[in-house]
Amino acid sequence: MRKGWIIMKAVLQVVSHASVRVDGELTGQIGPGLLVFLGVAEEDEQADLDKIVKKVTELRIFKDDAGKTNLSLQDVNGELLVVSQFTLLADCKKGRRPSFVKAGNPQKAEEMYEEFIRVCKEKVPKVEHGVFGADMKVELLNDGPFTIVLDSKEL
């Protein structure tokens, strides 16, 4: 275990639809599926990414015909929108201003973000995404709401 460090985090939201824009231009849009906000930490490795991808694609959080959350994103042929969000790695222990020193350096974080998208595309038919490091406007219609927070060190 990497002592004292936050590891890759993802916030999953079941959505009826979601989209992301950069400078007013649509960069990603999905119908029913998952919106994933992804935060990459400094010490993240491929194993962390693989654990998060597996949960995102296989977690049974969609309703079956009986209304029970029993189906995965893959089972329902859901769509996926991935948005980078380093603020998930905020450390708010001291003072009133969050620290982001545990977030991955931008080059490494972008590589991991792109790899996350690539691996998801192998498992999910439609994967859309935002622009790494950009100021984005995200619109979504939550379904539920149903929100899950994943931390790779806890998987």
Identify the meaning behind each predicted range.
Residues 13, 39, 84, 139, ...:
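Short beta-strand segments
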Residues 26-77, 88-118, 128:
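Compact, glycine-rich, soluble single-domain proteins
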Residues 100-155:
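Positively charged, low-complexity, intrinsically disordered RNA-binding extensions
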Residues 14-21, 28, 40:
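N-terminal intrinsically disordered, cationic/polar leader segments
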Residues 1-7:
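Short, Lys/Arg-enriched N-terminal segments with co-localized hydrophobic residues
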Residues 52, 83, 146:
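Residue-level signal for inorganic ion chemistry
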Residues 70-87, 133-143:
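A short beta-strand-loop-alpha-helix capping motif that often carries His-Thr
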